[in-house]
From Swiss-Prot:
HAMAP family: RbfA
InterPro entries listed in its UniProt record: KH_dom-like_a/b, RbfA, RbfA_dom_sf, Ribosome-bd_factorA_CS
Name of the gene encoding the protein in the UniProt record: rbfA
Protein's UniProt name: Ribosome-binding factor A
Family annotation (PROSITE patterns): RBFA (PS01319)
Primary location: cytoplasm
Signal peptide extent: none
Keywords assigned by UniProt, alphabetized: Cytoplasm, Ribosome biogenesis
Region (Disordered): 116-136
Length: 136
């Protein structure tokens, strides 16, 4: 099975959907942040492993606690996944915190700060220009 095959893409989507449902409804671990979402899933072509990219809304401690909770719940999730999805092999789940959303938010804040600085500078230039027009 090729990495980008249609079948592999469908399996990735199905595993992501099933895990999202399981994490939100079945897990009762207090370490897992309720604002945890699965960003992407990459199931290996041999169906032995699956990298599960998660995003956790919160501070770094919350991310670490959520990751620890998910790692300890991985065998349970794998068993539930085997019941929910009919696959030849049920993949071993490897959870990875995805920083791309936080990176995007921080870049957006930086862009907004730069734009706000440009607006202030252009406002100051306009007021300076008006002052010079009054002198003429």
């Amino acid at each position: 099975m090729r990495k980008n095959s249609i079948k592999n893409t469908r399996i990735n989507q199905e595993v992501q959907k099933e895990l999202s449902m399981l994490i939100s409804r079945e897990l009762k671990d207090p370490r897992i942040n309720p604002m945890t979402s699965i960003v992407a899933v990459e199931v290996a072509p041999d169906l032995k492993t699956a990298k599960v990219y998660i995003s956790v809304l919160g501070d770094e401690l919350s991310q670490k606690n959520t990751l620890a909770g998910l790692k300890s719940a991985a065998p349970f999730l794998r068993g539930q996944l085997a019941r929910g999805i009919n696959l030849r092999n049920t993949p071993e789940l490897l959870f990875v915190v995805d920083q791309s959303i936080e990176y995007g938010v921080s870049m957006s804040k930086l862009i907004n700060e730069v734009n706000a600085g440009n607006h202030k500078a252009s406002d100051e230039e306009e007021s300076d220009d008006k002052g010079h027009e009054d002198e003429q």
